[in-house]
Amino acid sequence: MQPIEEVSQDTMAFVVAPGGALRGRLRVPGDKSISHRAIILGALAEGITQITGFLEGEDTLATLQAFRDLGVSIEGPEGGRVKIHGVSLQGLRAPEKPLYLGNSGTSVRLLAGLFAGQSFDVILRGDESLSRRPMRRVCDPLARMGAFIETTAQGTPPLHIHGGQSLYGIEYAMPMASAQVKSSLLLAGLYASGRTCVVEPAPTRDHSERMLAGFGYPVEREGAKVCIQGGGTLHGTVVEIPADISSAAFFMVGAAIGKGSDILLEHVGINPTRTGIIDILRRMGAEIEIRETGVVGGEPVAAIRVRASRLHGINIPEDLVPLAIDEFPALFIAAACAEGETVLAGAGELRVKESDRIQVMADGLQALGISAQPTADGIIIQGGELQGGEVHSHGDHRCAMAFAMASLVAKGPIIIRDCANVATSFPGFLELACGAGLAIRHGK
């Protein structure tokens, strides 16, 4: 196994040697979705909120800094521990300048709903990638609630959210499954008169609903509909954040494809709205064992053991797509290593993530000798032998980490360009991957 080389901070490439196996017990960083929501609700609560397991990645730190800019006293993060002195729903102060949210689409969409109910104006901006992300899907239903939000002509950030608006509860049937849109409307609903209800066309992650309840705020669930009544109170609490299944996904796929691999991923969140990765890999023939199950802060957790398996291609059921939407870059690598054809449809959302993940992954797989045919809302991948080569992640952290795992079965080294954004979701990825058996280093 090659050591990690010390290089300058502006290095943008990973170089991964071929072969190897993943072995041992691993714990990936805390869940990104839950970390965002813990900061938001902790800031809006009355009293103190203590968080452990907080993900100290660039995206979640952007959310944390935004609330400091809004006058919230936050201690940490230090070793995943954060202490928030909540200011209550009406206690935020107007920021002195626009809030910079980096590459975090979660931050801008969730905070758009929150700031729609404030008495002051807020401008949300981000980096070049975030400035291309679509925001009308959240701004349009917020406008129906009475919000006044300006975007670019293309419906992208920066967002100028005008304060002093009176919000009214609505019932909104989402045209596309999106946990971010749902959560944004629920946050706006905290400030709305009456009842705010969101109806989902398919299940999405329910961390916001679970955490609102954990902070003492009543949440009603009726099948595909979730509702809250405005004007309540959040109470500070203790939040323990499990390991992120989206980060664990790379090691799950790596262990499934890497000959001789056998890993145990510890204390992973297995919220049933997030376990599509497990269901899909099992359908492909992966040997996955769930053990040491428990519940932490209202979220189910478990250890996940994955061993090298013989995978076969499948038609991925569309009802599993929302349950694995962030894990498809890793799953595309599994498909490339499987016998036969894997077909994905109904996943158009992948084209408007941090990158066009369908195209970026297809281009990379083709560069590595795999037949990968993009479609409007999915991809068709023919399993085969991965060659070495150079691929480009286009600044997408999940694509970069997925291609790194491909090296376990590649015939030659893989060079992955534009990897700086891996720090948005998985600080310490190289160190953990290297320790598990991946021959990965920084390069030029």
UniProtKB/Swiss-Prot annotation:
Leader peptide range in chain numbering: none
Cell compartments where the protein resides: Cytoplasm
Keyword Secreted: no
Protein's GO biological process: amino acid biosynthetic process; aromatic amino acid family biosynthetic process; chorismate biosynthetic process
Catalytic activity annotation: 3-phosphoshikimate + phosphoenolpyruvate = 5-O-(1-carboxyvinyl)-3-phosphoshikimate + phosphate
Key words, A-Z: Amino-acid biosynthesis, Aromatic amino acid biosynthesis, Cytoplasm, Transferase
CDD domains to which the protein is assigned, alphabetical: EPSP_synthase (cd01556)
GO MF annotation terms: 3-phosphoshikimate 1-carboxyvinyltransferase activity
Protein's pathway: Metabolic intermediate biosynthesis; chorismate biosynthesis; chorismate from D-erythrose 4-phosphate and phosphoenolpyruvate: step 6/7
The EC number(s) this enzyme carries: 2.5.1.19
Annotated positions binding 3-phosphoshikimate: 32-33, 37, 178, 180, 326, 353
GO cellular component, as recorded: cytoplasm
Principal location: cytoplasm
Residues given in the record as phosphoenolpyruvate binding sites: 32, 105, 133, 180, 357, 398
EC primary class: transferase
InterPro entries, per the entry: Enolpyruvate_Tfrase_dom (IPR001986), Enolpyruvate_Tfrase_sf (IPR036968), EPSP_synthase (IPR006264), EPSP_synthase_CS (IPR023193), RNA3'P_cycl/enolpyr_Trfase_a/b (IPR013792)
Active-site residues, Swiss-Prot/TrEMBL: 326
Function comment: Catalyzes the transfer of the enolpyruvyl moiety of phosphoenolpyruvate (PEP) to the 5-hydroxyl of shikimate-3-phosphate (S3P) to produce enolpyruvyl shikimate-3-phosphate and inorganic phosphate.
Subunit-structure text: Monomer.
Entry's family note: Belongs to the EPSP synthase family.
The protein's name in its UniProt record: 3-phosphoshikimate 1-carboxyvinyltransferase
